[in-house]
């Protein structure tokens, strides 16, 4: 109904994880814009919404990106829907584990070593052919030195 009301150049976004699958399916059908999910990842909503069989390809991010691109291209939506090339949850978990290893091996300068953490994030993003920008959480006069916000490049399915 909203695409009919506002047109196909309307972008839709939801922070409700349970709504990602029906949202993706509806946007694909109606031809609207889907910038990305609340938790950007090729695995978040896309496989079920597009009918992609993941069997035998669990954890294969490039397979998933290629499969999504194929489905979006069939529907003429490859330039109107996106995600991240690196699943955000996988990135956070892998970075946390790698940082913990560095910490346990005495390769950090104590409780939190921002340079080591940043280099780990940069390395993991680069492995997926993308970049990740880190920024510290700020709210007015409050700036938290150990609370980072992540922003990776959008994956362009039209390329």
Model region roles, listed by residue range:
Residues 1-159:
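A residue-level marker of the well-folded mature domains of exported/periplasmic proteins
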